Amino acid sequence: MWDLREKFERDGFVVVENVFNDQEIDEMKKSISKIVNDMDLAEHPKSVFSTYDEDKHAADSYFLNSSDKIRFFFEEGAVDKDGELTVPKDKALNKIGHGLHFLDPTFEKMTFNSKIQNIFKEIGYQEPGVVQSMYIFKQPKIGGAVTDHVDSTFLRVDPIDHLTGVWIAIDEASVENGCLSFIPGSHKDTSSANYRFVRTHDTSGGALLKFIGTRPTYDQSKFQHVPISKGSLILIHGLVVHKSEANTSEKSRHAYTIHVMERKNTKWSEQNWLQETENYKFPDLYKD
């Protein structure tokens, strides 16, 4: 991995091939299947996740309070106007978040894995803390697009470049099923981070979250598709611009993602939607 850091610093992302073997991928799939099968729909609001609707999560305490829980977010195309599912629940989910990495033994094992630890040592992280995890389904036919964005819009640290995402392909990710696309080198322009998703701290029944600043626009011709094989991962700088198209294929595009901050000499913004709780302090990625 001698050139991993060089590519990461140049492009703002880097593909690391074949990090997880078939057995490990199968373990994660089986674990998520059990979590979904055990979910009682009556106990969870059918919260629809959308990157297009800026007001969607504004009053959604179910989302806001999910940092130390395993919670379920549905595809727009899977819930009808009466709030009923139009497909089986295992085909209806957009994602599960945001505490899989410490609440589920399988995902904890895969997160605090020597292979992940070595990657972060390679890019120079000294005190990495895992702030969140998500399992993303990108369902066949209804898996929604994720609009162009930078992760630092949603998770802000100071210094601003002390945040990195890890995107693990549970299925092969191709152009057909909605692989990620990036603008190489876009992490060097910090102006994208002026647009932020923040807590309002409102206690009067108003919006709990809001976007501030002007939403940036990007030259769509600069995006490059980055297809990757099952078991490989993409390391994603917090300021690199990326997106994914809708999955209109017959194939699923599952992924497991985590976000990691360099805690050394770094401040976590009190405005971030995701915060530590009494039950959850960002765990050390390098823990034994």
Curated annotation (Swiss-Prot):
Chain residues that bind 2-oxoglutarate: K95, M134, H149, V150, D151, W167, S244, R253
Protein keywords: Dioxygenase, Iron, Metal-binding, Oxidoreductase
Annotated GO MF terms: dioxygenase activity; metal ion binding
Amino acids binding Fe cation: H149, D151, H242
Matches recorded under InterPro entries: Phytyl_CoA_dOase-like
Transmembrane domains' residue ranges: none
Pfam families in UniProt: PhyH
Family statement: Belongs to the PhyH family. PHYHD1 subfamily.
Entry protein name: Phytanoyl-CoA dioxygenase domain-containing protein 1 homolog
